[in-house]
Amino acid sequence: DLWQFGQMMNDVMREYVVFNYLYYGCYCGWGGIGKPRDATDRCCFVHDCCYGKVTGCNPKTDSYTYTYSEENGDVVCGGDDLCKKQICECDRVAATCFRDNKDTYDTKYWLYGAKNCQEESEPC
């Protein structure tokens, strides 16, 4: 679920970052349109696409299990439910993407607003 995604982001980035990404660019937050503005926004675009491929459960509300290793920074998705594992994998890839692209985060894209994202969306 989205709360777990926020927790995972905080784990992987080793700081409280959820609100920095909630309304970032054209794709971070609820939904998305237009073209991703930078590598950070592309993490959200890919995450949205990943959620769009999940069938049989709701990525925004269904919870899953995962473990986080502080030693090596890895997230491992657990549980027996394949659909929930898919949600977890979408979140794991996005959280890792945010960490790996932290240097691209640009405050000018925080609270960017959909009015600035009017181009045609690219396909997943």
Swiss-Prot record:
Cellular component GO terms, alphabetical: extracellular region
Superkingdom: Eukaryota
Transmembrane recorded as keyword: no
Cofactor(s) the protein needs: Ca(2+)
Tissues showing expression: Expressed by the venom gland.
Cofactor: binding details: Binds 1 Ca(2+) ion.
One biological process term in Gene Ontology: phospholipid metabolic process
GO molecular function terms noted in the UniProt entry: calcium ion binding; calcium-dependent phospholipase A2 activity; phospholipid binding; toxin activity
Sorted UniProt keywords: Calcium, Disulfide bond, Hemostasis impairing toxin, Hydrolase, Lipid degradation, Lipid metabolism, Metal-binding, Platelet aggregation inhibiting toxin, Secreted, Toxin
Binding positions (Ca(2+)): 27, 29, 31, 48
Reaction catalysis annotation: a 1,2-diacyl-sn-glycero-3-phosphocholine + H2O = a 1-acyl-sn-glycero-3-phosphocholine + a fatty acid + H(+)
InterPro entries: PLipase_A2, PLipase_A2_Asp_AS, PLipase_A2_dom, PLipase_A2_dom_sf, PLipase_A2_His_AS
Subcellular location: Secreted
SMART domains xref list: PA2c
PROSITE patterns per UniProt: PA2_ASP, PA2_HIS
Active site residues of this protein: 47, 89
Disulfide bridge map: 26-117, 28-44, 43-97, 49-124, 50-90, 57-83, 77-88
Keyword Cytoplasm recorded: no
Enzyme Commission code(s) on record: 3.1.1.4
Similarity comment: Belongs to the phospholipase A2 family. Group II subfamily. D49 sub-subfamily.
Function recorded in the entry: Snake venom phospholipase A2 (PLA2) that inhibits collagen- and ADP-induced platelet aggregation. PLA2 catalyzes the calcium-dependent hydrolysis of the 2-acyl groups in 3-sn-phosphoglycerides.
Protein name: Acidic phospholipase A2
Organism: Bothrops jararaca (Jararaca)
Lineage, opening ranks: Eukaryota, Metazoa, Chordata, Craniata, Vertebrata
